Amino acid sequence: MAVMPDKWIREKAENFGMIEPFVNHKSSKGVISFGLSSYGYDARVDNKFKIFTNVNSAIVDPKNFSENSFIDKETDVCIIPPNSFVLASTVEYFRIPRNVLVICVGKSTYARCGIIVNVTPLEPGWEGHVTLEFSNTTPLPAKIYANEGACQFVFLSGESECEKSYDDMKGKYMNQHGITLPLVK
C-alpha cells in the first residue's frame, strides 16, 4: 500500500467529490490547523456534540446503547468534563474509493493537552460524515473548537480494488450524516 500525496488527494476531492467541502490548502492562522497537507487531510469538527453524562445513571452498552447517556450541545467551543468523552462529527463528507483505505491520527495540538481523538478506518467504498470520538484524559475540563482541525486522515492506496467494498456489504454506518451512535445489527 502506498500513502497518497497532496496532488492525488486534491484531484480526487475536486474531480470525484472524495471530500466535501474541500479546503485545498493548510489553514492554520489563529486556529487548530485544517485542510490539505503533504500526505493527508486535516478534517474539521462540526459544532454539534454529544457529551457523556451520568445524570440518568445509564450504563454504556454497545449492544443496547441508550441515548440518555449523553447531553446534546450545539456550540463553537465544547467543554469536555475531566476524564470524560464526547462524540462529534466531521464538517467534511467523505467518499472513499474502492481501492483506498483511510486511517485517522490525532492532532498533536490536542494530544499535548491530553485530548485523544479516535476514529476507526474508513473502508473502501464507505461514504458519510465521520463520527469522531474525543477523550479527555486529564483531571481538568478541556476544550474542543468547532470548525477547526480535529484529526488527520491518511489515504492508503491498495494495489487493486477490493472484491467487496463497504458499500457492497451494506455496512451499517454507510451514508451516515452527523453523529452516529453505536449500532449492532
UniProtKB/Swiss-Prot annotation:
Keyword presence, Transferase: no
Keyword field contains Nuclease: no
One Pfam family per UniProt: DCD
Pathway: Pyrimidine metabolism; dUMP biosynthesis; dUMP from dCTP (dUTP route): step 1/2
One GO BP annotation of this record: dUTP biosynthetic process
Active site: E133 (proton donor/acceptor)
Transmembrane annotation, as ranges: none
Catalytic reaction list: dCTP + H2O + H(+) = dUTP + NH4(+)
InterPro entries: dCTP_deaminase, dUTPase-like_sf, dUTPase_trimeric
Keywords noted in UniProt: Hydrolase, Nucleotide metabolism, Nucleotide-binding
EC number: 3.5.4.13
Listed GO MF terms: dCTP deaminase activity; nucleotide binding
Protein residues bound to dCTP: K107, S108, T109, Y110, A111, R112, T131, L132, E133, Q152, Y166, Q176
Role: Catalyzes the deamination of dCTP to dUTP.
Family of this protein: Belongs to the dCTP deaminase family.
Subunit record text: Homotrimer.
Name of the protein described by the UniProt record: dCTP deaminase
Gene: dcd
